[in-house]
Each structure stands twice: as structure tokens, then as C-alpha cells.
A protein has these predicted regions:
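Positively charged n-region of N-terminal signal peptides that target proteins for export
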Residues: 1-5
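Bacterial N-terminal signal peptides
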Residues: 8-16
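Sec/Tat signal peptide C-region and signal peptidase I cleavage site
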Residues: 17-21
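Residue-level detector of conserved, function-critical positions
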Residues: 22-584
Length: 584
């Protein structure tokens, strides 16, 4: 099978992605290789990107960065990156040049814009339509957020809008825009500007929060007291507190009283919970905030009453009815590390709440990781050996951190392991599969669990109630997509559906991922395609030594060492002619 097949590991946690029926269909494009160089063809087999590049793909970022890159924004997969002579550029799927082959490194696409760094080490921005946002070159930039990017020239910061308008870099520090306003520092004091650079709030404060949230911005006056202003600069909540949370969440913020205890206020400054907590550990989420009391950690309501105690080292906000919790040990060791890159200052709960190893934070440092100065430092770093768990809004344990490992919660449940065995619980905490399996691969899209028992045999379980769909008698089982599964018996592969029905006997040398309802299988006479019912989709006179899954009605096939394209009837759209092929 074509080399882009992913290999599954026993402990892997798979989250299936679904393409919405409302999403526009992208033009078919395949990368092709000829005489050692890459280009691209369309669905008719016509060359749309010249075959003259060293590399070509949807993303040429490092492998561990490609997922974030390709999911950075809607429409990202309509762009193809090419490289020649160490420089890169972008094309559309139809072959239109978006960014010329000119940059050495880049950011990810955000809000239809991309930051690129050229050979001169200066940074500029392009739009997806290929236009240059500004001809000014910057030393450091952020991604665009809410229509504005922070830019640095020399030692000062400014802003650039998507339409190329610049707020001149005159500020000592700058923070992101939110609702058309941003906090900036000039002459040692903080104020608030609009998107034209006009001051809405004069620079009179010693510090501010990261950005407006729910119409409020935290500010610190010359007496080192904190309060909040509204969008007009009015001190709705006059500075009177030693510390406050950086932003409101669900209409509430945390405040530190004279007693060195924390309480809650609403957006008008009314105290809803008098100072009583040793720390506030999370912003409000789904009506609850993680807090530290004299009796331990728990979750509190806006009025300060404790919903339930949660005796864990770390608490996290709720999401879809579940909150992550963690327990862990702390140790300090020396490591060699790169210094962080940030424009302005970081801002997070840890500055106030003295919960030093809490990973939850409202981070506002900015800058592209590609702009590292290349300097290493030896420094002591605190390492936390953590174990994750999940609880619901009553405090019920859904997945205990006492397990050796609890994986990130999925839409239907949670994978966990203990003593070298794997299990699965649903989001109510019911064990669907107890921790008795030596391997477990959740397939949430098809609602099944691929499980391996202590005899090294694989079976298929229902994700709904754990009942056995396929018996534990197979050397291997693979999820093939489209509700189909491959099972291996006596060295050959057969096909089954998600109900456990065997659609074919074990006849095939290999199987691969289904594409558009057609399943590639390998016989002694090469690769063929099956229908969902397990029948041959079409006969073909040629022997396919390799194939790709179908995409947009076409599949790649390799015949006598060359790649071509066929449609779903087996007809050649592009006869085999290329050294390599990759459907994008």
C-alpha cells in the first residue's frame, strides 16, 4: 500500500475527524514526481504546478508541527507549499502562486495571513490572495489576532492590520487586541488604544491585564492596587485590591482582600463571595471555579459555597461536564534550554495564586517559535511527574488519577491504563472495557474498541456496552474507515463491518484504509478495490503494485514502476507516467 499509511500503536488514542457535508469540496490535486523533481496535477491529470521543486506538499513544516499547521484555520488545506533551493512558497490547488518561492521559515496561517522570514532575516506578511499586506519589514511579529498583529522594529512595538495599516512601533510593550482595544506601555505606564493608535485610556497605570474580557480590563494604579475599567476607561471597579484575576469569566473575577484571602466579584464590582479562599485555581467554567480552602481543594459557586471538595494537586476548568484533575510529584533538575520568545510580558494565574506548578494559565506571551535567537542556557527546571484524572460536576470520579495513565477525554469516553493493561470508561464513569487488555484502540467514529487480550489475540468490542462484536481469535484487527475493519487469520486478511459481520473470508495479503466507500486489498495478482459489501468494485487489465485510497473520485495506482490515476470505474484519468504520487 502507498507509503502514507499510518501505523497504529497499541496504546494510541485515536480521535476521528468528520468532514461536514457543508464544507466546500476542494479541487483534486496530486503531487507527482518526475526526474527527481516534484509538481502537481489536477483531476484531469494536467500539470497545474510545474514539476520543478525539491519538495511539495500541503505542509513542509516539521512532522510534529504539521497537524497544528493544517488545522490552523478554515481553508488551510486549499494551499500547497513548495520548496526549491532551501526557499519555500505557496500555491493554490489550481496552481495560482500565492507567495513566491522566497522565504526560509514561516508562521502558521491565521486569519488569512502568513508571516514569512526571508533571506534577509526580516519578516513580512502575505494574504491568501497573494497580496503583500505591508512592504515594511519587521524584526519580530505575532500571529494576527482579531484583525491585528503585534510587530517589532528595533526595541519598540506597534501593530499591523490585515488591510496593511500600521500603528507605528513606538511602544515599550504591546498586548493583543480584543473588541477593538489593546493595552500598550509607553514611558513606563500602561494605557489603552484603539485600532488606529488613538488613546482611549491615557497611559497612567503601572500594569494592566492581558486584554479586555467581558467588557472589563484589569488595571493596577500607582498605589499597587488592582481594579477594572470598562471600554470607555471608566473605573467601574476602582483599584482597591492587592490582586485580581487577569480577566472575567462567566461574569465573575477573583479578588485578593486585605486578609490575604480570595473572593469573587461580578462585573459591576459587587462582592458575590467574601474573601475566604487561600487561592483561586481556575476561572469560572460551567458555573464552578477551582479553589483552595483551609481544608483542601474544591470547586466553588459564585456565592462562595463549596459545590464539592476535590482533593487533587491540580484542578482544571470544566468542559462539556468534565474537569481534568492531576496529582503529581515535583523535582528540580538542571537542563539546557532555549530562552522563550515573547513580546511584552507573560500574564497568568501563577503570579498571584502561588500555585507554582499549575499548568492552567491565561497565556498572553506572543511571538513565533521560528524566531529563536539560537542561544542555550543551563538552568534549574522544576519537573512534575503528573497523573491525570477526570471528575464530573458533582465531584464523582470518572477516571481516577490512581491509574498509571489516563488519556485525554474523547467525545464518547476515556482510555486508561493500569499495570500494563488498558480499559475504557464512558463519560459517566461506567467501565465499558475493564483494564484487562494488553492493547486497546478506541474508534469513536465507528463506536467500537479494537482490543487485544492476554493471549495476544485481537477482538472487536462495542463502545456502547462492551459486548463482543468479533471474537478474540485474530492475530490483528485494523480500523479501515467507513465502518469497515480488517481481521488477520492464518496470515491472510478478511473484511468485517462494525456490527461484527464478516463480509469476506481471509483472502488478502494486505488491506488498507477505505476511501469514498472503496477498500484497497492486495491479492497475489496485485492490489484491487472492494465495495462496502466485499465485492470487487471493477476488474482491470493492469496489475497494480501499489495504490492510494480514493479521494474526490480518484485513486493513485502504480503499474510497472510508474504512477497514474483512475476513477471509480477503473478508467485511467492519467496513465501511469510518474515516479511517485501523493494525493493532497
Amino acid at each position: 500500500m502507498k507509503k502514507r499509511t499510518l501505523l497504529l500503536t497499541l496504546a494510541a488514542f485515536w480521535t476521528a475527524t468528520t468532514i461536514s457535508a457543508n464544507e466546500p469540496t476542494l479541487p483534486f490535486t496530486a503531487a507527482v514526481k518526475e526526474n527527481g523533481m516534484w509538481g502537481a496535477v489536477n483531476g484531469a491529470g494536467q500539470v497545474v504546478i510545474p514539476i520543478s521543486y525539491d519538495r511539495l506538499g500541503l505542509s513542509l513544516s516539521e512532522a510534529d508541527e504539521q497537524k497544528e499547521d493544517l488545522l490552523s484555520e478554515e481553508g488551510r488545506d486549499d494551499l500547497i507549499e513548495a520548496e526549491k533551493g532551501g526557499l519555500r512558497g505557496f500555491f493554490t490547488r489550481t496552481g495560482k502562486e500565492v507567495i513566491p518561492i522566497s522565504y526560509e521559515s514561516r508562521s502558521i496561517w491565521k486569519e488569512g495571513a502568513l508571516a514569512v522570514r526571508g533571506k534577509d532575516k526580516k519578516i513580512s506578511f502575505y494574504k491568501k490572495d497573494g497580496s503583500l499586506i505591508s512592504r515594511a519589514a519587521y524584526d519580530q511579529v505575532s500571529d494576527f489576532e482579531n484583525g491585528m498583529a503585534i510587530v517589532k522594529q528595533g526595541a519598540t512595538y506597534g501593530y499591523l492590520s490585515l488591510d496593511g495599516k500600521e500603528v507605528k512601533p513606538v511602544y515599550q510593550e504591546a498586548r493583543f487586541f480584543e473588541d477593538g482595544l489593546a493595552a500598550v506601555k509607553e514611558k513606563g505606564r500602561w494605557g489603552v488604544i484603539d485600532m488606529t493608535g488613538r488613546y482611549i485610556v491615557s497611559p497612567i497605570y503601572k500594569d494592566t491585564g492581558a486584554a479586555f474580557q467581558e467588557g472589563r480590563l484589569a488595571v493596577k494604579n500607582q498605589k499597587n492596587l488592582w481594579g477594572y475599567i470598562d471600554r470607555e476607561g471608566k473605573e467601574i471597579i476602582p483599584p482597591a485590591y492587592k490582586a485580581v484575576s487577569p480577566a472575567f469569566s462567566e461574569g465573575y473575577a477573583a479578588i485578593l482582600g486585605d486578609s490575604k484571602l480570595w473572593g469573587f466579584i461580578d462585573t459591576e464590582g459587587n462582592v458575590t463571595a467574601k474573601p475566604q479562599f487561600k487561592a483561586v485555581l481556575t476561572p469560572f467554567s460551567e458555573g464552578l471555579s477551582g479553589v483552595k480552602t483551609i481544608d483542601g481543594n474544591g470547586y466553588a459557586r459564585p456565592d462562595g459555597t463549596i459545590a464539592f471538595m476535590a482533593d487533587y494537586d491540580q484542578l482544571f476548568p470544566f468542559k462539556d461536564g468534565l474537569a481534568e484533575v492531576r496529582e503529581g510529584e515535583v523535582e528540580t533538575r538542571a537542563v539546557r534550554s532555549l530562552p522563550p520568545i515573547s513580546i511584552g510580558i507573560g500574564w497568568g494565574w501563577g503570579d498571584w495564586l502561588a500555585f507554582r506548578h499549575h499548568p492552567w494559565g491565561w497565556g498572553w506571551g506572543i511571538g513565533l517559535p521560528i524566531w529563536y535567537p539560537g542561544r542555550y542556557d543551563d538552568e534549574p527546571v522544576t519537573s512534575v511527574t503528573e497523573k491525570r484524572g477526570y471528575i464530573d460536576k458533582t465531584g464523582k470520579v470518572i477516571a481516577s488519577p490512581a491509574n498509571d495513565r489516563v488519556f485525554s477525554a474523547g467525545r464518547k469516553g476515556i482510555l486508561l491504563s493500569k499495570d500494563g493493561r488498558y480499559g475504557w470508561v464512558d463519560r459517566e464513569g461506567t467501565y465499558i472495557a475493564h483494564t484487562i487488555y494488553t492493547g486497546l484502540l478506541p474508534d469513536e467514529e465507528d463506536g467500537v474498541l479494537l482490543a487485544k487480550d492476554e493471549n495476544k489475540k485481537w477482538g472487536l468490542l462495542s463502545m456502547e456496552d462492551g459486548h463482543e462484536l468479533l471474537p478474540f481469535s485474530y492475530k490483528e484487527i485494523r480500523s479501515l474507515g467507513s465502518g469497515l475493519f480488517g481481521y488477520k487469520e492464518e496470515g491472510k486478511w478478511g473484511i468485517a463491518d462494525k456490527e461484527g459481520t464478516r463480509l469476506t473470508a481471509p483472502l488478502y495479503l494486505a488491506v488498507s484504509k477505505a476511501g469514498e466507500g472503496l477498500l484497497p486489498v492486495k491479492t497475489k495478482n496485485g492490489w484491487r478495490f472492494l465495495t462496502p459489501a466485499g465485492h470487487e468494485a471493477f476488474p482491470h487489465d493492469d496489475t497494480f503494485s501499489d495504490v492510494t485510497p480514493f479521494s474526490s473520485g480518484l485513486a493513485g495506482v502504480k503499474v510497472k514502476g510508474k504512477w497514474g490515476l483512475i476513477d471509480q470505474t477503473g478508467r485511467y484519468v492519467m496513465r501511469p507516467a510518474y515516479e511517485d504520487l501523493d494525493i493532497l
